Amino acid sequence: MKPTVISAEALFEAHRTALRWEWLAGHAHPERRFDEVAVRDAQSAADLVGYLNYIHPYRVQIVGRREVRYLVDVPPEDQERRISRIVTLEPPVVIVADQQTPPDRLVAMCERADIPLFVTEESAGHVIDVLRAHLSQHFADRTTRHGVFMDILGLGVLLTGESGLGKSELGLELISRGHGLVADDAVDLYRVSQTALEGRCPDLLLNLLEVRGIGLLDIKAIFGETAVRRKMRLKLIVHLVRKETMERDFERLPYEPLYEDVLDVPVLKAVIAVDAGRNLAVLVEAAVRNTILKLRGIDTYQEFIARHRIAMEGDEPI
């Protein structure tokens, strides 16, 4: 599920410093919110913020240099009609950017209709970029998964598996080998675009790793700043299973890459059997390196199949 509301006041306060804007009109209803249907139907944040557009009234309307010219460089009756049309459509927020002075009629009508009007000297394009990034994160589909989320060789890797298989101990071993911790036990995952998932740690568990027999470890305090990460894009799920489960439910050499859907985004998956004497940290690193090759278009298994086919056809000696 994803949130479907955000108030004008929350949007203003979130970027008061970055965009250096002023709330000029429409103070009476600071809790004014986006249309919930528009938020649910939005395919991306681009549907929620953009330049002045009468066809998409339910998004934040950005008024830049050209839009101000469109509104004011006309006879008074046309100016009244064009500005009235903006206000009648009841957008959640109107923002005047590009160092432009908002027309007096726009200020008056927004004040009368209780539509928040923000003014900033920042460029309209920059305002759109900042707000789209913010709304993309705020309205993202989200879920919480159990596991250990790590940065391994620059790749976001989620370690999952049954309780008691040593996920946290494996995470600690990987941290000692120079990799970074994002989250332990509970991992918040957000779909920040149609094909990308971002994982973060809940504030309550930030920098903490729980190991049986030892308790809670503050990874940042023990290993330093470079041992923790604020967030990572999820690229690989490493699923730990018992040996008997591996033999019963999984192929030794799967012909096709394994994937797991998370928030309707397919994520590459590697399955590793936990057994006495196996160096899981080395195996996870190997799985990550192999995934990096796959993401670059190099599939070792398919190359082996191609070699085998050539050998079977007699083009090369076996």
From Swiss-Prot:
EC number from the UniProt entry: 2.7.11.-, 2.7.4.-
Region feature Important for the catalytic mechanism of dephosphorylation, mapped onto this chain: 273-278
UniProt binding sites for Mg(2+): 168, 210
Region (Important for the catalytic mechanism of both phosphorylation and dephosphorylation): 209-218
Enzymatic class: transferase
Transmembrane helix as UniProt keyword: no
UniProt catalytic activity: [HPr protein]-L-serine + ATP = [HPr protein]-O-phospho-L-serine + ADP + H(+); [HPr protein]-O-phospho-L-serine + phosphate + H(+) = [HPr protein]-L-serine + diphosphate
GO molecular function, one term: protein serine/threonine kinase activity
Residues noted as binding ATP in the record, renumbered to the chain: 161-168
Co-factor requirement: Mg(2+)
Active-site residues annotated for this sequence: 146, 167, 185 (proton acceptor), 252
The protein's assembly and partners: Homohexamer.
Note: Both phosphorylation and phosphorolysis are carried out by the same active site and suggest a common mechanism for both reactions.
Role played: Catalyzes the ATP- as well as the pyrophosphate-dependent phosphorylation of a specific serine residue in HPr, a phosphocarrier protein of the phosphoenolpyruvate-dependent sugar phosphotransferase system (PTS). HprK/P also catalyzes the pyrophosphate-producing, inorganic phosphate-dependent dephosphorylation (phosphorolysis) of seryl-phosphorylated HPr (P-Ser-HPr).
Record-stated family: Belongs to the HPrK/P family.
Record note on domains: The Walker A ATP-binding motif also binds Pi and PPi.
Protein name: HPr kinase/phosphorylase
Organism in which the protein naturally occurs: Methylibium petroleiphilum (strain ATCC BAA-1232 / LMG 22953 / PM1)
Gene this chain is encoded by: hprK
